[in-house]
Amino acid sequence: MSNKQHRVPDFYCSYLLRSIPKPNSFYIGSSPDPVRRLRQHNGAVRRGGAYRTKRNGTRPWKMVCFIYGFTSKIAALQFEHAWQHSYKTRFIENNERLVTKKNTRNGIATKLGNARLLMKHPYFDKMNLHIRFFDRLAWESWELNKFKVDYGLSLCEVDEAVLTDESQLDELDELNLERIKAFYEDQMAQESSLLQRYQDNLTYDQKSCMICDKKIDYIHDEGTQMVGFCSDDECDFLSCLSCLYKEFTKNSKQIIPKSGHCPNCHKCLEWSQIVKYSTVLREKLIKD
């Protein structure tokens, strides 16, 4: 049996494609690299891409939105499968289903309604998933919320450039790829910068948990406990991950918290992000 520590992926998303020449054609997938995956679907990369996106007359595709923040690859694949099979997935209650038959054709409003239903399920809800839009019509459909599914508005993001987009039809796929690339690269740069700050904090000197006062020494102790940080640039809070977990759940009935406030600066922090950086940092420092 492997003793390998679970690591939250740097990035993994479940995405919705829409055919530009055939706007009633959609495709749902998942990937750790949406830029490369979109290029595969559009034939710019020879290997990869799904059979359904290769059908005559459907290319090029644009990625109208993706959902990200999954705490594991398995969770992202489960979301993808549930989104593709919304008519039967266990993650949507029977009395809430928008689609009840396999071959029912449904438009953007139904696709996004199903995304809302999945995001509100307790299993995915605890991950604090975000949905990012790269298409104005898709974003407007989300905002309209045709099926009145009450979830996700606070975690909705939209690429502001698409709100004033007047691009020609033959430019849409290239601009869509550029916007997704810009967001993905910015996201990865932010992740790298934050991780480097945490790493510097741990390796420059011996630290102590600011809750239990236990010494935290990543310099000499390879088996040291995982650590939780505050993401605020002006806050130097750190603690044992287990101590922060107890702090976040002491007045809650939730086994896994969604969020909590930094004991030092009181900023609201997403638990899934704290765990993510804790696992990545531990793996990186042990390897180094």
Swiss-Prot record:
One of its GO terms (cellular component) is Slx1-Slx4 complex. Belongs to the SLX1 family. HAMAP family: Endonuc_su_Slx1 (MF_03100). The keyword Magnesium does not apply. The lineage of its organism: Eukaryota, Fungi, Dikarya, Ascomycota, Saccharomycotina. A zinc finger (SLX1-type) spans 209-265. It comes from Kluyveromyces lactis (strain ATCC 8585 / CBS 2359 / DSM 70799 / NBRC 1267 / NRRL Y-1140 / WM37) (Yeast). It holds the Pfam family GIY-YIG. It comes from the Eukaryota. This is Structure-specific endonuclease subunit SLX1. It is found in: Nucleus.
